């Protein structure tokens, strides 16, 4: 039950954020979107460092001077994995007019949902690999540290849910469909978490690689999507401030609960 709830918490954060479409009448302003993107980026960077990369290196201590290698290799595999998905799947980032990936007849709404879904894949993997480490008895990963990551992802998923549902509403979708789009974008997280747990249980020695793989995938999303989004326009400083806030919140959660 503990693991089930931990996997579900980030998804609930997305759903709660998507529900904002029922209570807010206007679309999110540029200032708000940049603030939310900065906060999400800060949480993801802190989670990648404190919850994923450092435990990956600690678990490889027996390799001596090569203890960095699993984290190094897994990190690059994660980056390349997201780069490949980015090129293979048609998607449209919020606020952009030009779709990325192969040409497609998909609607703008569908491609916007796909963009956020791509973003959520590494987050689900990160939660899954943390709980896999806990279930395997890894001394570097406790139930509390896994919960800290789950809560941190849920916190940054709340604004993400709003970031997808509100623009969908602005695109002309009714509130119900806009909410559903936000919820569906987060559904990949518990699925990814469960698949990652199953994979890790089969190959426990690969846990350091899986931890750093999730970190690489998350940081790819931060650099490719969130940093440009939070830095646009004359309000760019607000994105930086909220990045620092998100980083601080996730760091505090990891240290306090881990």
Regions found by a protein language model. Name each.
Residues 1-258:
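Intrinsically disordered, metal-sensing/regulatory segments
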